[in-house]
Every structure is written in structure tokens, then in C-alpha cells.
A protein has these predicted regions:
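C-terminal helix-rich "cap/oligomerization" subdomain common to oxidoreductases
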Residues: 1, 65-68, 76-78, 274-327
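Beta-loop-alpha module in the N-terminal Rossmann-like domain of NAD(P)-dependent dehydrogenases
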Residues: 51-101, 105-118
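N-terminal Rossmann-like dinucleotide-binding module
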Residues: 1-48
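A contiguous active-site-proximal alpha/beta segment in oxidoreductase catalytic domains
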Residues: 84, 107-167
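C-terminal substrate-binding/catalytic lobe of Rossmann-fold NAD(P)-dependent oxidoreductases
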Residues: 214-268
Length: 327
């Protein structure tokens, strides 16, 4: 029997991936909420979705369904709202007897994780989060190869992620550190989670560059030394970007070899949903290390590098090719 899903933040950028995953796992969307009412996308999935611009009426609707016949109640709430609302919307879902599938970051501040675990125990419902890079076939294969190597070996890793964003980004909630968690959280958390999953926990962390649109630093992990760089500045792309064309560059070099994972992103959310429905979702314990790390990065001052710096910083931030070298 199909399960019933509800979605918060349904008008946002990420929600179509969740709507597709709900459909492709054989389940049905019954309710959605967003303060913005440009939600015609719902008709691509169902004409029977109850939509509420007010979160209070959405909450009331879920409560009424919970008190009705079992086949009508909401079994899962998918949370696609802005980062600073995730914690509150997780609590709303649990209060209404639903499991949770929450976009990353699960929360902005790590001290909110323990209360959510208490709510899991109280309600008997699980909180899962979307760590989609952990289900990417190429990255699963890489982890298998790394796990077969001597654990004492330290890999050299260079992470570069630049994604062009216009002026809108800075005035939206995404450009507000209080509401998004800042650059390291909003665009970096899935990459930091990947690094921790592949190479183990943090022994040392330094921030070498801290600007509203750029950050860079160094991580010493259990099995890797990582030089990282994040940016929403179009000038940091190693190619000329035009509106409507490719605007993102991601590169991970492991021991000098490029990790190729640019393909295979189309169904990762569906794979995450399949894991959740099989009882194998990524929970609070999985999400905690990266949330703690980005909180530490967000609150750390930029310091003069005591060790290795990202190639972009070594070469300067202009006239770069894909390896951070001057052309």
C-alpha cells in the first residue's frame, strides 16, 4: 500500500527532487505547504494535493489526518524549507506522528541534535536526512577501495567547489548566515559529510579565507589531509559561465587523481528515499559529524596557514585554470 507524504517548502529549488522520489518509490503526495504560492509544479505529480500557504493550517490538517482512518494519515513529512526552519518542521512532523526525511543540513546548530533524538525516542518515529553523495555509485566504489588500504596511510585531497550565484543569493535567506548557516553549511555540508565519510574524523581544522562569497581552509582527517575551497563567486569558475549554461565546478583530487562523479546525480534522492523506506536511512548519528564541523568552521577566525593551503590561495584568486594555477 502506498504511503502518504507531505512536504514543507514545496515552492523551493530542492523540492522537485523530493516530489520525484516520492512518486518513483510508489508513494503519494497528499499535502504541502509554502508561504509562496507559485506551486503549479504540484500538478505534475497529482491534482489531489492539499496546499497550505500557512504552516499553522498545514499543521492542523496533518493533525486531523492523524486522528482519522489509518489509510489517510501522513506517514512521512519531507522537509525542503529554508535551513533555519528545519528543526521546527522536524518537530512539527514528529508531533503529528510522521517520520521525517529532511534536506541537509538537518539543523544549523549542533546543540539541537540531542533534543531531536529525545523526540525520536518519545514518538517512536525516525528522523532521516538527505546525504545523497553517500549513495552515489562512484563514491561508494571509492570508499570500498579506500577501506581496503592501510588505515595509517594519509591521502592528499584537494576539494574545489565553485557555483556561480547572482545578486539574488545575497539578499535571500541563503545569503544570511543566521538563516542558512553560511557558506560552509549551505553549499559545503554535503561535501564535508563526504570527506568525513571517506576519510574519518577531524584531528585539526584551520580556516584560511573567510569572506561572504568565499571560504577556504585545511582539514587534517584520520586518513587524509584536505585543502578545501568553496565559492559562489562567478570569477572563481575555471571557465566562462553564461546565464542558462553550466555554472558549477566541482573537483576532488585524491593523491593527485581526479575523482570523477559529475554524472549520476539524477536519481540520488530516489536512492535515499529507498534506503529510508527500507529502514536504512541516514539518521542523526550520521549527520552529526558534518554539522559539528561546519559549525566549527563558521565560528573560526581566518588564520595564517600553518601548513598547506589550497592551490587557489597559493596562486592568487584570479586567472586560474581548473587546478588553481595561473594561466
Amino acid at each position: 500500500m502506498p504511503l502518504n507524504f507531505a512536504v514543507t517548502g514545496v515552492a523551493g529549488y530542492i523540492s522537485p527532487r523530493h516530489l520525484t522520489a516520492i512518486r518513483d518509490t510508489g508513494n503519494r503526495l497528499v499535502a504541502a505547504t509554502d508561504p509562496h504560492d507559485s506551486v503549479g509544479i504540484l500538478d505534475q505529480f497529482s491534482f489531489d494535493v492539499r496546499f497550505f500557504p500557512e504552516i499553522e493550517r498545514f499543521d492542523r490538517h496533518l493533525d486531523k489526518l492523524r486522528r482519522g482512518p489509518e489509510e489517510n494519515r501522513v506517514h512521512y513529512v519531507s522537509i525542503c524549507s529554508p535551513n533555519y526552519l528545519h528543526d521546527a518542521h522536524v518537530r512539527l512532523a514528529l508531533r503529528n506522528g510522521a517520520g521525517v526525511i529532511c534536506e541537509k543540513p538537518l539543523v544549523i546548530n549542533p546543540w539541537n541534535l540531542d533534543p531531536l533524538q529525545e523526540l525520536e525516542r518519545e514518538t517512536g518515529k525516525a528522523i532521516s536526512t538527505v546525504l545523497q553523495l553517500r549513495v552515489h555509485p562512484a563514491l561508494i566504489a571509492l570508499k570500498s577501495r579506500l577501506d581496503m588500504l592501510p588505515q595509517a596511510h594519509k591521502h592528499d585531497v584537494v576539494l574545489t567547489y565553485a557555483t556561480a550565484r547572482g545578486y539574488w543569493y545575497r539578499v535571500s535567506w541563503k545569503g544570511s548566515e543566521e538563516r542558512s548557516g553560511g557558506l560552509a553549511t549551505n553549499i559545503g555540508i554535503h561535501l564535508f559529510d563526504l570527506l568525513l565519510w571517506l576519510f574519518g574524523g577531524v584531528d585539526q581544522s584551520e580556516v584560511h579565507l573567510k569572506e561572504p562569497r568565499r571560504m577556504a581552509g585545511f582539514l587534517e582527517l584520520k586518513r587524509a589531509n584536505v585543502r578545501w575551497f568553496l565559492s559562489t563567486n562567478i570569477d572563481d569558475l575555471p571557465f566562462t559561465a553564461q546565464p542558462g549554461s553550466r555554472t558549477t565546478y566541482r573537483s576532488i583530487l585524491v593523491d593527485g587523481k581526479e575523482l570523477e562523479f559529475t554524472e549520476g546525480f539524477t536519481d540520488l534522492h530516489t536512492r535515499v528515499y529507498q534506503r529510508v523506506l527500507a529502514g536504512e536511512g541516514f539518521g542523526i548519528t550520521d549527520a552529526r559529524p558534518s554539522i559539528e564541523l561546519v559549525y566549527q568552521i563558521r565560528n573560526a577566525p581566518a588564520v595564517k596557514a600553518s601548513g598547506e593551503m589550497h592551490p587557489y590561495l597559493v596562486a592568487g584568486l584570479s586567472h586560474k585554470n581548473g587546478k588553481g594555477e595561473r594561466k
